[in-house]
Amino acid sequence: MKAVEANFDGLVGPTHNYSGLSVGNIASKNNKAGASNPKQAVKQGLEKMKALHDMGFVQGVLAPQERPDIATLRRLGFSGSDANVLQQSHQYSPQLLAACSSASSMWTANAATVSPSSDTADGKVHFTPANLINKFHRSIEDEVTGNILKATFADEKHFSHHEALPHSDYFGDEGAANHTRFCNEYGEQGVEFFVFGKSAFNDRYPAPKKYPARQTLEASEAIARTHGLRDKFTVFAQQNPDVIDQGVFHNDVIAVGNKNTLFCHQQAFLNQEQVKSDLSASYGSGFNVIEVPTDKVSLQDAVETYLFNSQLVTKSDGKTLIILPQHCRENPRVWAYLNELVEQKRGIDELHTFDLKQSMQNGGGPACLRLRVVLNEAEQQAVNQQTLMNDMLFSTLNAWADKHYRDRIEDKDLADPQLLLESRAALDELTQIMKLGSVYPFQR
């Protein structure tokens, strides 16, 4: 059955702010305490979604989390009315309030790991929400993420939903940001590629020294088992710990794959030649590796421009398009390399850039903003159709953002009870627009 690779992008939430919460993410740290513009951020994301829809791709929308997360703040000892909880947390632990107000769920590459039905033992699409235990502000997402995924992919005949892995450092899981899939055609058996930063139980694997490795081998293996993947078509590889220490906090900051092509930096993986050999052996003939040499694009340029945090997509005419942040065009070395790559006809045919400044300043490029879901025709019909981008949804969500979102948020605004009310009103209306039901705690 013919299949497509759909992209489900996360809507930026109403509390989008720059709190510098993500250790190891240089852009997040460098923009800490700056004023954010949630309305601009959500509209930049919507523009990207609409552009992909207009190019002929199946484009979906995933709802954001409820923030500030009052329930978590109450678990941490703050009490009284919601306004009192905000006031107390701002007074005694502003860092906690910032963490519980993060709009980081916009980066749906971390929402879950997804395996298509052509790869799984039971012939269903499998979803496992990421536990994201390495960062507190993201570790409180997985329950609601699961609710949103179940409301988006509700038909049990086609979709299987798992709980997040245990909330332990042994099973640190960052979702699809450390996972990609290679295939000849999307609806055929593919090779699922899991990249980890460390092993929890086996000290023969080196670990980074400066920044944390967020994904463990054990987590990746558990997801492969849970999804019923075939060993022959599953490859595990370790990310180079030295590049983690230089700001490559997820594999999707240093590599991206699509169909038969792996586009990666020369320093992306530990034992890189063996990784390429393992992938080629599992894939078979025709596997294409575009390895970017350090003397063409330095690691620093790769991280600063988010060259590899791009989307590789296949157009209906068979050509491969790479969707890049505007930062790549603005860097002469990176832009020269990309144009040279297209001229060489090595597997990337066209370049397209987007202005995603609000997301980029918090450390997330085009690939961070999307969760890839391969769907055959029957599965596409089984998806909640109100979550799929079209002209009407684009118009509706822009009007919704104009109605509910602020155009400026600073740290002090997170304690404003009115922001909580605005956020809940926005999400309540959103669940009606997208027919999600009661996915948020405040709706119960």
From Swiss-Prot:
It catalyses: N(2)-succinyl-L-arginine + 2 H2O + 2 H(+) = N(2)-succinyl-L-ornithine + 2 NH4(+) + CO2. Coiled coil: none annotated. GO terms for molecular function: N-succinylarginine dihydrolase activity. Keywords: Arginine metabolism, Hydrolase. GO terms for biological process: arginine catabolic process to glutamate; arginine catabolic process to succinate. Its EC number is 3.5.3.23. Pathway: Amino-acid degradation; L-arginine degradation via AST pathway; L-glutamate and succinate from L-arginine: step 2/5. This is N-succinylarginine dihydrolase. The gene is astB. It is an enzyme of class 3 (hydrolase). It comes from Aliivibrio salmonicida (strain LFI1238). InterPro entries: AstB_sf, SuccinylArg_d-Hdrlase_AstB. Belongs to the succinylarginine dihydrolase family. Catalyzes the hydrolysis of N(2)-succinylarginine into N(2)-succinylornithine, ammonia and CO(2). The lineage of its organism: Bacteria, Pseudomonadati, Pseudomonadota, Gammaproteobacteria, Vibrionales. Substrate binds at residues 19-28, 110, 137-138, 214, 252, 362. The keyword Hydrolase applies. It comes from the Bacteria. The active site is at E174, H250, C368. Homodimer.
